[in-house]
Amino acid sequence: LNLTKWLGKLGVILSHLNK
């Protein structure tokens, strides 16, 4: 499991949602 990759994608999505 590449949690770092997943967390990175999640971070990007959350950033877009926060805007």
From Swiss-Prot:
Main localization (coarse): secreted
GO CC terms: extracellular region
Keywords in alphabetical order: Antibiotic, Antimicrobial, Fungicide, G-protein coupled receptor impairing toxin, Immunity, Innate immunity, Mast cell degranulation, Secreted, Toxin
Family membership noted in the UniProt record: Belongs to the MCD family. Bombolitin subfamily.
GO biological process: defense response to bacterium; defense response to fungus; innate immune response; killing of cells of another organism
Organism for this UniProt entry: Bombus lapidarius (Red-tailed bumblebee)
Function description: Mast cell degranulating peptide. May also display antibacterial and antifungal activities. Its mast cell degranulation activity may be related to the activation of G-protein coupled receptors in mast cells as well as interaction with other proteins located in cell endosomal membranes in the mast cells.
Protein name in UniProt: Bombolitin-6
Keyword Membrane belongs to the record: no
